[in-house]
Amino acid sequence: MKVLVSFEIKFKTNKEKIISILKHFGFRRMQENLYFGDVEYDELYAMQSDIMENIREYDSILTIPICKSCYLKLNVFGRNLSFKDELYKIF
């Protein structure tokens, strides 16, 4: 499943831990605090568990699953992001 992860992390060390977790699960950076990945349901839950163990009460993280229909409607404005990469291929 395609997933966007957006976060606001107060301290750099916590942010580095979250980024490390996202990279471990194959997520790639799209913007400063926005990552995109393609994971199975069990991987998503494992990733969310790892993240929950490493965030603080003042941090916020949003995971957004993207269905095939919504992914097909994706628009990119401004700086061009390449969706030709294998990670971004449609289901």
Curated annotation (Swiss-Prot):
Keywords: Antiviral defense, Endonuclease, Hydrolase, Magnesium, Metal-binding, Nuclease
Gene3D superfamilies per the UniProt record, alphabetical: 3.30.70.240
Keyword set includes rRNA processing: no
GO MF term set: metal ion binding; RNA endonuclease activity
GO BP terms: defense response to virus; maintenance of CRISPR repeat elements
Pfam family, one: CRISPR_Cas2
Signal peptide: none
Binding site for Mg(2+): K10
E.C. no: 3.1.-.-
Cofactor: Mg(2+)
Family: Belongs to the CRISPR-associated endoribonuclease Cas2 protein family.
Job description of the protein: CRISPR (clustered regularly interspaced short palindromic repeat), is an adaptive immune system that provides protection against mobile genetic elements (viruses, transposable elements and conjugative plasmids). CRISPR clusters contain sequences complementary to antecedent mobile elements and target invading nucleic acids. CRISPR clusters are transcribed and processed into CRISPR RNA (crRNA). Functions as a ssRNA-specific endoribonuclease. Involved in the integration of spacer DNA into the CRISPR cassette.
Record HAMAP family: Cas2
Alphabetized NCBIfam families for the sequence: cas2 (TIGR01573)
Assembly notes: Homodimer, forms a heterotetramer with a Cas1 homodimer.
Protein name stated in the entry: CRISPR-associated endoribonuclease Cas2
